[in-house]
Design a protein with these regions (language model features):
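Extended, hydrophobic interaction surfaces within ordered domains
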Residues: 224-266
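Ankyrin-repeat-protein effector appendages
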Residues: 2-15, 34-38, 176-181, 204-209, ...
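N-terminal segments that cap or nucleate solenoid repeat domains
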Residues: 3-73, 278-307, 311-319, 324
Length: 436
């Protein structure tokens, strides 16, 4: 069925403001004039002259809801994924926002997503595009760095800004006065990623690290500089976690001697460390072949899942050899193989499959389903989903995972979920011929 121009314009907007830009690119390649179809399209694609022409003809249009989403024009520009997905159009989109602001656009323009999620223009700039220039532009125009409103879910701006490797956008938002409790909360999100520069920025720009943040960092095997930054910013050093373990005990259990040294230098209580902690650490570091007797098996299972999430192949092997269960704790919803596949960790997938891991899971899911879902949604193998585009997920790692699973006899699901993409379509997108 051939779409008319308004339908194609709506399809362009839908794709340009989503994580999947492929249809937007195809539509623009087929009909470059579609970028100037209306004010919404011109904003989303960075057509500066067209935006200026329309504003000159009708100045009040700068703040009127328009286009297929009924948004103010500035929102189409700020939420356009072309800002980070098309280097040719990005300068134009920034200039569009500048001209809209000069013409009186509201830097706090917003819409409500899915009934109760507040989405402000700054979220598009800092949390979706990760664009320092646009973030600074909106803040200088008066955008509120705290996206919170009674009755709606907020905290999208900083929560997602801290997912990017460059800490600049998150820093700009914090320094502009983001509410302190949100800064503290989002430090936890930042710790999901292996980026010490981001954590150091949080810690030197007002974040108040908790004991939980310190435990999170050590359990996730973050580097010594991250642990030092958290402690130096006030994280309680000897508080126990939910398992009754201090940060030093956790570091010793991982065999992380450099992290343990940082903790000891800053006064961690050495008397809390037990022979069991040292025995587990000796096994995981390869100094001893076995863990001490009496270890609760679920503790090994949990450490193995964390090792898989972090991509630690040697630790995973040693934990399996020490008694961690190949399919994980039966009481847990987490599958070790599912974690490896979702995160695109091919070597770990191969290790688990060769050791006999089940290809289907207790919850009805499957290893191949986890891999296919990750190929569309897992932007970072440690941090998981973020606001980046599908294009930014390295497809080669998922293609290798699929080859391993298919060779082991895994079957491709018809669809991902009740109304998701077809499994064979996703397999083909990874450059693999779907099995007969």
């Amino acid at each position: 069925m051939t779409l008319d121009a308004p339908e194609r314009a709506a399809a362009l907007i839908a794709s340009a403001t989503s994580a999947d830009l492929r249809r937007a690119r195809a539509l623009l390649d087929a009909d470059p004039a579609l970028a100037r179809h209306d004010l919404a399209c011109a904003c989303a694609t960075g057509e500066v002259d067209e935006v200026s022409r329309r504003l000159a003809a009708r100045p009040v249009a700068v703040s009127e809801p328009t286009g297929p989403n009924g948004w103010q024009p500035i929102l189409y520009a700020c939420f356009s994924r072309l800002l980070r997905g098309d280097a040719r159009r990005a300068p134009g989109i920034r200039e569009v926002v500048r001209r809209l602001l000069d013409a009186g656009a509201d830097p706090d323009a917003s819409f409500i997503h899915d009934g109760d999620w507040l989405q402000v223009a700054l979220y598009g700039a800092a949390g979706i595009a990760g664009d320092p220039e646009l973030t600074r532009m909106l803040l200088e125009a008066g955008a509120d760095p705290t996206d919170d409103r009674d009755g709606y879910h907020g905290n999208e701006v900083l929560y997602h800004a801290c997912e990017f490797p460059d800490p600049t956008c998150a820093m700009l938002v914090i320094d502009a006065g983001a509410r302190a409790d949100l800064v503290d909360y989002d430090l936890g999100r930042a710790l999901n990623f292996p980026r010490p520069e981001m954590i150091e920025m949080f810690c030197t720009h007002g974040a108040r690290p908790s004991a939980g943040n310190l435990h999170q960092a050590v359990w996730r095997r973050r580097p010594p500089r991250t642990v030092a930054a958290l402690i130096d910013a006030g994280a309680p050093i000897d508080a126990p976690d939910e398992h009754g373990l201090t940060a030093l005990q956790i570091a010793v259990r991982w065999g992380e001697e450099t992290v343990a040294a940082v903790l000891r230098e800053r006064g961690a209580d050495e008397t809390m460390v037990t022979a069991t902690d040292r025995g587990i650490g000796a096994c995981i570091s390869g100094a001893e072949p076995h863990v001490p007797t009496g270890i609760v098996r679920s503790e090994l299972d949990e450490m193995m899942v964390l090792s898989i999430q972090g991509g630690h192949l040697a630790a995973t092997r040693r934990l399996l050899d020490a008694g961690a269960r190949i399919d994980g704790d039966p009481k847990s919803e987490e599958s070790p193989l599912g974690q490896a596949c979702w995160r695109g960790r091919a070597e770990l997938t191969r290790e688990l499959v060769e050791r006999g891991a089940a290809l289907t899971f207790r919850d009805g899911g499957s290893a191949i389903g986890a891999a296919l879902h990750g190929s569309r949604h897992c932007h970072d193998p440690e941090g998981g989903p973020s606001m980046q585009t599908v294009d930014e997920i390295p497809s080669d790692r998922y293609a290798e995972v699929l080859r391993i699973l298919l060779a082991a006899g895994a079957t491709v699901p018809d669809r991902l979920g009740e109304s998701g993409a077809r499994g064979t379509t996703l397999v083909a997108e990874l450059g693999i011929d779907p099995p007969d």
